Amino acid sequence: MQFQTLLVVAGSLVASTLAVNSTVTEHHTTEITITHCSDNKCATSVAPAVQSVNTVTIEGVVTEYTTYCPLTASEHKHKESSSPSSVAPVASTESVVTTTISGVHTSYTTYCPLSGSSEASTVITPGTVAGESSSSSEEVSYVDVTSTPVVESTTDVELTLTAQSTLFTSYANSTGSSSSSSVVPSANVTTFEGGAVGGASNQITVGFAAIAGLAAILL
């Protein structure tokens, strides 16, 4: 049983592992699908875009104008460079949206950089928006996901104690010429599990008491 217990403990120690923290970062970007048709033929392309939001409130009516402008290679180049000498003018398209509410005329003008086949798409969405933004902005959001596996291990140890008492007896020969002694081991062998140490101590105490009694009789 002791060897089996040692094997169980060793197996538990080998199977236990440390918790590992892994971080996953997710980047979110906005992409638009551009469909260009010419001569009864249409071509579709996907490009990253920046979002421009204009919000107008007239007589309690909130109107949100969202414009997506596709990014071009020249825009990326200008954003990465910080020196003013690298900035060059870029051709752009002008998008004008005019609304009339209760006799009030409002015009919204948006400029988008001109690329080979890019066109600005405007989406009008009524709703309530907290703030107003009139310039194009690029938004990057990060999401951190942390996973911590939990490893649980349980170790059970079984304790076994064996106690054996030996009784010494002496007797006198009837002729009075000689005496002899003998050692008689008792056959009381007790096995304890867990914390049963008190029983072994009691049996050893009884053995010593028997020896003391025999010594008193002989004297």
From Swiss-Prot:
Annotated membrane topology: Lipid-anchor; GPI-anchor
CC terms in the record's Gene Ontology section: extracellular region; fungal-type cell wall; side of membrane
Induction and repression of expression: Up-regulated by high iron, during biofilm development, and upon ALS2 depletion.
PTM summary: The GPI-anchor is attached to the protein in the endoplasmic reticulum and serves to target the protein to the cell surface. There, the glucosamine-inositol phospholipid moiety is cleaved off and the GPI-modified mannoprotein is covalently attached via its lipidless GPI glycan remnant to the 1,6-beta-glucan of the outer cell wall layer.
Pfam families: Flocculin_t3
Propeptide residue range(s): 195-219
Entry keyword set: Cell wall, Glycoprotein, GPI-anchor, Lipoprotein, Membrane, Repeat, Secreted, Signal
Signal peptide: 1-19
Glycosylation: residue positions: 21, 173, 188
Record protein name field: Predicted GPI-anchored protein 6
Organism, as annotated: Candida albicans (strain SC5314 / ATCC MYA-2876) (Yeast)
Gene expressing this chain: PGA6
